Amino acid sequence: MLSRSRCVSRAFSRSLSAFQKGNCPLGRRSLPGVSLCQGPGYPNSRKVVINNSVFSVRFFRTTAVCKDDLVTVKTPAFAESVTEGDVRWEKAVGDTVAEDEVVCEIETDKTSVQVPSPANGVIEALLVPDGGKVEGGTPLFTLRKTGAAPAKAKPAEAPAAAAPKAEPTAAAVPPPAAPIPTQMPPVPSPSQPPSGKPVSAVKPTVAPPLAEPGAGKGLRSEHREKMNRMRQRIAQRLKEAQNTCAMLTTFNEIDMSNIQEMRARHKEAFLKKHNLKLGFMSAFVKASAFALQEQPVVNAVIDDTTKEVVYRDYIDISVAVATPRGLVVPVIRNVEAMNFADIERTITELGEKARKNELAIEDMDGGTFTISNGGVFGSLFGTPIINPPQSAILGMHGIFDRPVAIGGKVEVRPMMYVALTYDHRLIDGREAVTFLRKIKAAVEDPRVLLLDL
């Protein structure tokens, strides 16, 4: 064993000497991962001493693309009121994406945030599973950049027309008819004697089995779907409102005759000047701001931590908008300084963003009062639930012709029921009823707003 080790050592020494002198055919070429002691040192290298000869063995990795071409995309920063969200992937590993193309969507408590691709490239890896929870700054996916945008697929060329079938050159000649027999053929003698039982010409058939009761009807089934984060948050907030607030609702009805007449008379001029349609929501938003200035307690809120009442000198009205994902409430800020055109423009912009699922969290943060319009769905009557941490909410309903007493006579007028749900811990019945009557007066006669009555 000892002699064998010495032989191996001598053979290795001779090879090493030949390598150092250049006699080895590989001595003049650089070997990957191996360098002589005269070469520079590397942080990932280690030195090996064999027969007083020092070698440096370097371990490394190589890649075909520069590191700068591989980008890690992280979760965008959330607002202070949002801590995490659920990821829903729109692309998979290996998909080619263009710059600003949506790769995934992060669903938070309030809205959905779309994460676009920062450049043209190919998805290398998805770092979070579908449905996984992420926080702000969490790595989402890696993208390998490419030079140009992905080419659109060319439309498939129409297949070549099939060659027309060859038409028959001549009609087929029918075969000659067989001769008609003039005599009946002889009756064959039976090989077995006939039995005494008659033979039926029709084979007996078995009646089909009777169908089970209810088999022809549709099958009864059920399926389950996980609640999305927005629906969970809505359920949580509404239950918090019921458990925290002492909610009470007061009602009134509004004659919509004058506001309908004003809209019909000025909608064309309004559209021509502002390029906006004149609706009823702007009238209720403006009337609510007018009433909130008269009754500031409705615009206030209780701070349960410090047991204080917070009065706001600004009016930010949240307008409820129904989307396929759930109810969202974007905020119209500083309504007290707006006119009808400003309100209509803001409502149009927020509604368009809500339908396209482009609302940012900043669009829904805050709000001192909420208006919910169930009338667009044909609602006749209802009691809305407060949107915490606010103290009141106005519920609008449908406009229906009803007989009402006007000056001692019965007339048919377009009427709307309105409901005000408020936190009775802070707002007394007198303030709530006065507030709702202010809205009624401003909508029934818009001149009240002009004259500040």
Curated annotation (Swiss-Prot):
Binds 1 lipoyl cofactor covalently. The modification Phosphoserine is found at S81. It is an enzyme of class 2 (transferase). Pfam families: 2-oxoacid_dh (PF00198), Biotin_lipoyl (PF00364). It is found in: Mitochondrion matrix; Nucleus. Keywords: Acetylation, Acyltransferase, Disease variant, Lipoyl, Mitochondrion, Nucleus, Phosphoprotein, Transferase, Transit peptide, Tricarboxylic acid cycle. InterPro entries: 2-oxoA_DH_lipoyl-BS (IPR003016), 2-oxoacid_dehydrogenase (IPR050537), 2-oxoacid_DH_actylTfrase (IPR001078), Biotin_lipoyl (IPR000089), CAT-like_dom_sf (IPR023213), Single_hybrid_motif (IPR011053), SucB (IPR006255). Changing Y422C: In PPGL7; uncertain significance; not changed dihydrolipoyllysine-residue succinyltransferase activity. Its cofactor is (R)-lipoate. Residues 173-196 have a biased composition (Pro residues). The keyword Phosphoprotein applies. One of its GO terms (cellular component) is nucleoplasm. One of its GO terms (biological process) is L-lysine catabolic process to acetyl-CoA via saccharopine. Dihydrolipoamide succinyltransferase (E2) component of the 2-oxoglutarate dehydrogenase complex. The 2-oxoglutarate dehydrogenase complex catalyzes the overall conversion of 2-oxoglutarate to succinyl-CoA and CO(2). The 2-oxoglutarate dehydrogenase complex is mainly active in the mitochondrion. A fraction of the 2-oxoglutarate dehydrogenase complex also localizes in the nucleus and is required for lysine succinylation of histones: associates with KAT2A on chromatin and provides succinyl-CoA to histone succinyltransferase KAT2A. This is Dihydrolipoyllysine-residue succinyltransferase component of 2-oxoglutarate dehydrogenase complex, mitochondrial. It comes from Homo sapiens (Human). The gene is DLST.
